[in-house]
A protein has these predicted regions:
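Non-catalytic pre-domain segments flanking phosphatase-related domains
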Residues: 1-8, 30, 34
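Mg2+-dependent phosphoryl-transfer enzymes with acidic/Ser/Thr/Gly-rich catalytic loops
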Residues: 1-5, 21-22, 194-279
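Active-site phosphate-binding/coordination module
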Residues: 20-128
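Residue-level signal for inorganic ion chemistry
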Residues: 32, 43, 67, 155, ...
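Short active-site oxyanion
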Residues: 36-40, 59-61, 153-154, 220-221, ...
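Short, structured coil segments at secondary-structure junctions
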Residues: 57-59, 67, 176-178, 237-238, ...
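Conserved acidic, metal-coordinating active-site core of Asp-based
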Residues: 106-225
Length: 279
């Protein structure tokens, strides 16, 4: 069956290691859209951080952001939004007080007070980079719970890989773990992990499934391309699941199709192979 919807992760997938969109990716995406294929960017990034990437692609597309919590167009029209109940966020923060140094609250707001933090240790170079790229959105508040005046999109933690795995294990074992979902994005080479605590029903896969149903596409007509653990659910849903050559090793050993690395234009290669080939 022909591919009618292509879901593409951003970091480590669409973008190369310099943060650019390789020309081969741009050409393949444009060719797919010209054939009537719909494209969705599906990312852990929040909307305002993903939008500049979307705007580099001069084609209509849907943005599934915050690991599936929000679905929006480039023009800002919202199709779906699932927020983390503030009381669940409060309970999570209370149960992870010893990880407070790397904790953030993210809200669906304009620039001001979009990201709240209590205290951050900037010794990790990746965390310093996060600060540099997001400083205009960051506001300090003590205690962090005081910022829960409305439901957040998520509670986000940043830290080393081993530290965040320990946190993930703790969150999985809490008695109220059914109140939230946990998504992890690991960068082992940088020893840096983003751990997101979201609404219990949120994942890239769930959002992609709902969007495909809304658009009238069967799973067999959906292609997904990703590289990290937070892409697993959408890869499991898609009829054609493709992992990047630079993906986490565990992702490449699950019997999925493997394309080139993000520096080799692996997204474009996959689209050429599975969506643009003549049948």
């Amino acid at each position: 069956m022909a591919i009618r919807l292509i879901a593409i992760d951003i970091d480590g997938t669409l973008l190369d290691s310099r943060g650019q969109v390789p020309e081969g990716n741009q050409r393949a995406i444009a060719a797919a859209v010209e054939r009537g294929v719909e494209v969705a960017l599906v990312t852990g990034r929040r909307y305002t951080f993903a939008l500049p990437v979307a705007e580099r692609l001069p084609v209509p597309l849907t943005m599934i952001v915050n690991n599936g919590a929000l679905v929006r167009t480039k023009q800002g029209e919202t199709f779906a939004r699932q927020l983390l109940p503030r009381e669940s966020a409060r309970r999570v923060l209370g149960a992870t007080a010893d990880f407070r140094m790397g904790a953030l609250l993210l809200f669906d707001r304009p620039k001001e007070n979009q990201i709240l933090y209590e205290s951050l240790d900037w010794n990790n170079p990746s965390r310093t980079d996060y600060w540099r790229r997001n400083r205009e959105y960051l506001t300090q508040i003590t205690p962090l719970e005081a910022g829960l005046t409305e439901d957040p999109i998520q509670v986000m933690y940043t830290g080393g890989v081993a530290e965040m795995r320990r946190l993930g294990e703790r969150l999985a074992g809490l008695e109220f773990a059914n109140e939230y979902a946990v998504q992890m994005t690991e960068y082992e080479a940088k020893n840096f992990t983003l751990l997101d605590v979201l609404h219990a029903e949120v994942s890239k896969g769930a959002a992609l499934r709902h969007w495909a149903e809304r658009r009238g596409y069967a799973a067999s007509e959906v292609m997904a391309i990703g590289d990290n653990f937070n892409d697993r659910e959408m890869l499991d849903f898609a009829g054609v699941a493709v992992v990047m050559g630079n993906s986490v090793a565990e992702m490449r050993s699950d019997g999925r199709h493997v394309t080139g690395t993000n520096d080799e234009g692996g997204v474009g290669q996959a689209i050429e192979r599975f969506a643009l080939r003549e049948t």
